[in-house]
Amino acid sequence: MRHGVKTSKLQRNASHRRALLANQACSLILNGRITTTLAKAKALRPYVEKLITLAKRGDVHSRRLATATIHNTTAVKRLFDEIAPLCAERKGGYTRIVKLGQRLTDSALVAMIEIIDLPREAAEKEEAPATTEATA
């Protein structure tokens, strides 16, 4: 019986799963959004939510716990200095999962997970085409 079991094993052993979640959390913190399978996104969501809640405390002990969890000082710095102040008013639900359909190669369900309160500057820069006219 699996009563009370909240985590998904993702077909990996414990150390591989821990490394996978740490790497994906680091990528999500640095980029703001990532595209992955739906199962990995659902497993990543509580992991990142706990990190953001930890970062909202802002003390040295929380910073050390976050560094021990994701092993990337650049991501920890961005988490504490940029993301945590943006999420200060929100009590939870810092991430959003958007289902994107199936992958063509293996029909795996693909989803995009993103941090809600981040500004969309990067997305707007990608969408706006550069209008440069050649003068001849």
UniProtKB/Swiss-Prot annotation:
Q: What is this protein called?
A: Large ribosomal subunit protein bL17
Gene that produces this protein: rplQ
A cellular component term (GO) from this record?
A: cytosolic large ribosomal subunit
Instruction: State the family it belongs to.
Output: Belongs to the bacterial ribosomal protein bL17 family.
Q: Name the InterPro entries on file.
A: Ribosomal_bL17, Ribosomal_bL17_CS, Ribosomal_bL17_sf
Output the Gene Ontology terms for molecular function.
structural constituent of ribosome
Kindly list the biological process annotations in GO that this record carries: translation
Q: Which UniProt keywords apply?
A: Ribonucleoprotein, Ribosomal protein
Pfam families given for it?
Ribosomal_L17
User: What is said about its interaction partners and assembly?
Assistant: Part of the 50S ribosomal subunit. Contacts protein L32.
Record-linked SUPFAM superfamilies: Prokaryotic ribosomal protein L17
